[in-house]
Every structure is written in C-alpha cells, then in structure tokens.
From Swiss-Prot:
The keyword Cytoplasm applies. InterPro entries: rRNA_ssu_MeTfrase_G, SAM-dependent_MTases_sf. GO terms for cellular component: cytosol. S-adenosyl-L-methionine binds at residues 84, 89, 136-137, 155. This is Ribosomal RNA small subunit methyltransferase G. It is an enzyme of class 2 (transferase). Its EC number is 2.1.1.-. It comes from Prochlorococcus marinus (strain MIT 9313).
Length: 247
C-alpha cells in the first residue's frame, strides 16, 4: 500500500485494517462520493484529498476508524451530527456506513452546504441526511438540535476546547461527543480538561491509531456529559474561538 494506485479501487487489506467491510452497495456509494467530490471541487473548494490513498485512507478510513462500536451495530437507530462537515467527512461516509442512522451535517459556508445537499441526493441519502447552513454556535442553542443527539462529532475544525464547546450542548443524556484529532499532547489534555469542567462533561476515552501506508497518527477523543450542559454554552458566534474555555 505504497502509492495512489493501490487504492484506486480499495482491496480487502484496507477493510481488514479497519475491521469492517462495506457491502457492495456501500462500496459503490463510496466510489460515487469520490466522483461527486471531483465534480464539485471544480466549483467549490471542498477538499484536495480526492484521489487514491488520499481519499481512501485520509478521508474514508480516517472517518470510520474511531467508530468501531457503531459499525458493529450499524442498523441501530441513532441521531448523529457532524459539525463543520466541509466536503462530507465524516458525515456522508458515516451515513453510508450506518444505514440505521440519521445524520445532520452542519457547515457555515453556503456553497459547501449546497454541495453537501446535492451529493446526499445523488447518493440516495436524502431521507436520512439533513444539511444545515449555519454557525455551530447557533446550532448548539437551537431547540431543534440542543440535547438531542446520540453522537456529535467534528473533524479538523478547531482546538479541542473549542470543539468541545460546540459538541457537548448537542448531546442527549446518554450521548457521546467524538473529537477527531491529529497530534495530541499532555498540554492539549490539560486544556481540554479545563474546558470540560465548565461544560460539565468528562473525557471517557482517548485512542491513538496509526493510519495505513504510513499516513500519520490520529487520535480519537470521546466525551460524555455528566450533567446537563449549562445554558450559556455554546457562547455567542465567534466567542468560543476567540476565548477558548479554560484559557
């Protein structure tokens, strides 16, 4: 697995490394998503990672590896939300892999949400995928979203304290927040712990994973609320990023 050609049509070694194998229909949808990204990238800057291993490892594999438990119970009804969905990762890939899930995709860039809606329709996912064009701070205070999700996630959005402030208010009492991280250090952990005390949530899992083909190291962080999130969070638009909790 040393070059792009190895993943022009992924073989079983990729799925063996993941510990999950898509059905033929799911694989076709993932290949179709790749083609749609190529088309939309000509109009909207969604992602540069659309070819070969860039797509199959850096996008698909990286979106799914933290979700082992969910993948083993793929038909289970659950509500998920992806904040800062961008080109649809992890949200659209998750919608393909978890046929029992309803997925909400959130992005503040109108051109990206238009692309997400169009791609979801082409993939036959419209009945289970909702797209919202708005800032995450608004989503977290909207009664239609606040406190309603089994899984809230964000990938490549901001620092961990900022992302936690976006995600924790969205969780139902039994729900979990999933933060996709690259580098993770003791100082990062200290900063997140300060934020979680204010959000009344705990870090329940941290897992490190090396991507196939020497594509780098990733971490997943799982959070769970200990008490209802204080109504003041998330703070008004722009404040979480300018003044991260605990800083």
């Amino acid at each position: 697995m040393s070059n792009q050609a190895c993943f022009s049509n992924p073989g079983p070694e990729l799925w063996n490394a993941l510990g999950w194998h898509p059905s033929s229909e799911q694989l076709e949808q993932m290949i179709a998503l790749q083609a749609l990204l190529r088309q939309w990238n000509a109009r909207v800057n969604l992602t540069r990672l659309v070819e070969g291993g860039d797509y199959w490892i850096m996008q698909v594999f990286d979106s799914l590896w933290p979700l082992q438990s969910e993948l083993q119970n793929a038909q289970q009804p659950r509500r998920c939300i992806d904040i800062g969905s961008g080109g649809g990762f992890p949200g659209l890939v998750l919608a393909i892999a978890l046929p029992g899930a309803r997925i909400t995709l959130v992005d503040s860039v109108g051109r990206k949400t238009a692309a997400l809606k169009a791609m979801a329709a082409k993939l036959g996912l419209t009945s289970r995928v909702t797209v919202r064009s708005e800032r995450a701070e608004f989503t977290g205070q909207d009664p239609c979203c606040r406190g309603l999700f089994d899984l809230a996630m964000a990938r490549a959005v901001s620092t961990a304290p900022v992302v936690a402030e976006y995600l924790v208010p969205l969780l139902k009492p039994s729900g979990e927040a999933l933060l996709f991280r690259g580098h993770w250090s003791p100082n990062d952990a200290k900063d997140l712990a300060k934020a979680l005390r204010l959000l009344q949530a705990d870090l329940i899992k941290m897992e490190r994973r090396e991507l196939p083909d020497n594509r780098g190291v990733r971490h997943q962080l799982r959070l769970r609320a200990t008490l209802p999130c204080p109504a003041t969070f998330p703070r008004p638009i722009g404040v979480p990023a300018k003044n991260p909790l605990g800083s």
